[in-house]
Amino acid sequence: MLLDKLSVLSFLGLAPIFAAAQLSGSVGPLTSASTKAATKTCNVLDYGAKADKSTDLGAPLASAFADCKSGGLVYVPSGDYALSTWARLSGGEAWALQIDGIIYRTGTDGGNMIYIEHSSDFELFSSTSEGAMQGLGYEFHADDNWSGPRLLRLYEVTDFSVHDFILVDSPSFHFSLDTCTNGEIYNMAIRGGNHGGLDGIDVWSNNIWVHDVEVTNKDECVTVKGPSKNILIESIYCNWSGGCGMGSFGSDTNVSDITYRNIYTWSSNNMMLIKSNGGSGFVENVLLENFIGHGNAYSLDIDSYWASMSAVDGDGVQLSNITVKNWKGTEAYGAERGPVKVVCADGAPCYDITIEDFAMWTEEGDSQWYSCESAYGSGYCLQDSDDHVSYSVTTSTVSSAPSGYSATSMAADLTTDFGSTVSIPIPTIPTSFYPGATPYSALMANSASTAAASSIASHATVHSSSASVAASVPSAVAPSESIPAATSAVVSSAAAIAPSPAVGAQEGSTTSAPSFAAPSGAGNSPQGPTGASGFGEKGQQGEQGEQGEQGEQGVCYV
């Protein structure tokens, strides 16, 4: 239900310390949704919207935003809405978008169905954890059209969160974070078709925390593109997906301080793919920790000659200081696609690569291989030398399982994909994303009849788990799941004590944001990440849309 500004009280969230060294500062909105609603509430029904699944929501949503963009809450109540003209919501400050209804795509234009740009102190959420966008992408895909609209894109948004929201069956990408800063994404379910080009979450931004998200598709699960810095991605459930990755990378790559932690991958193309083909620049300071996989084609796949993208001019992207730690589980067929593949550019050999506590075994057959090229560091086929010169592919084959490879499975592992030419049902958001890990924030719908408010603090305070408010109740008590156990703390000028996350917490160091240079060409928006040709299109109003990746289309390796 709509936030009752008279009965719902905000609380000051005790946020985690910088959740890992990869976060450089606070994430999440600066004020709670209840505070914004108390300032002003703009209900789309008052602007001409109708929950009849046929009246266009586009104009009412834009009008409601215009009235609340300077401080307030835009409210889409429960019900079924049609969106035939896309909503470009630009220039908001201290505002929230509460979508408790389901928005169905009825238009056919390209671009982005909901595009939020140049905003600060922003929150998008569903108080029922059931709000959704249904892209009905199968209507495009049945005609072999893979370049329809994206569902949701944020561009140059600062101090924000998106949570308790569902994205289904996008004609193209589902969710893009483009040149954003200080954001938190959590408690989401994304379900797309079984085909390349239907990315789950793509991030090219600075100081972003993505956690507790499930993705089903056959391309990117949660992927970092360039330029990016200070990105923490954890508790991700790639449930019959393409898998998590980084790239594809081309010229002038600038990516650093990236952590993937607690990643569960089932029946996907890979557990982690770092991809490029030529190009220049660097990827450095990467931690890939606590991965569990079953039934995937590839496990660790670092490929600097990735054949699914056209070669880019340059000696190659320089990869360095990458740690792969605590990987368990099984791959589909290790004799055909081994669990360790580290192929670096001959013109830019990678170095300081560490693979430790890594135990994977094949589900089919009785052997598997490890393969390296121009790769230096420690573990498996990596060469240990200070002379980082190129060398040819070296492959070793083993015929006995490593000790300790056995790993648990998730009860919700899908038994089949959803295809790409029939309607995909809207899922519920799960309450478990990685075996044994409790989500950082309870679903708003499951908050024990409480209202979890966003942290209210100065920008210097570390924010996190920034759930706004759920059902109307006389008082608000934070759900126990929303605040991890305290281990150490940072005290801000507001004297807020910040417990750290339960896994691998450490104090983060503040670093400068990467430079996001505007490209030449139409419009003033930035150039998106460079990818293989296939699914990108020019966006709206002169926007230079990011180029999509073709991926391994329709491939299922199990």
From Swiss-Prot:
Signal peptide: 1-21
One protein family per Pfam: Glyco_hydro_28
The keyword Transmembrane helix belongs to this UniProt entry's keyword annotation: no
Biased composition (Low complexity): 503-526
GO biological process, one term: pectin catabolic process
Gene3D superfamilies noted in UniProt: Single-stranded right-handed beta-helix, Pectin lyase-like
The EC number(s) this enzyme carries: 3.2.1.171
Residues bearing carbohydrate: 145, 239, 254, 321
Catalytic residue positions: 219, 294
Presence of keyword Cytoplasm: no
GO cellular component: extracellular region
Cross-referenced InterPro entries: Glyco_hydro_28, Pectin_lyas_fold, Pectin_lyase_fold/virulence
Key words, A-Z: Carbohydrate metabolism, Cell wall biogenesis/degradation, Disulfide bond, Glycoprotein, Glycosidase, Hydrolase, Polysaccharide degradation, Secreted, Signal
Cystine pairings recorded for this chain: 42-68, 221-238, 344-350, 372-381
GO molecular function: polygalacturonase activity; rhamnogalacturonan alpha-L-rhamnopyranosyl-(1->4)-alpha-D-galactopyranosyluronide lyase activity
Region called Disordered, residue ranges: 503-558
pH dependence: Optimum pH is 4.1.
First-level EC class: hydrolase
Chain's role: Pectinolytic enzymes consist of four classes of enzymes: pectine lyase, polygalacturonase, pectin methylesterase and rhamnogalacturonase. Hydrolyzes alpha-D-galacturonopyranosyl-(1,2)-alpha-L-rhamnopyranosyl linkages in the backbone of the hairy regions of pectins.
Protein name per Swiss-Prot or TrEMBL: Rhamnogalacturonase B
Lineage: Eukaryota, Fungi, Dikarya, Ascomycota, Pezizomycotina
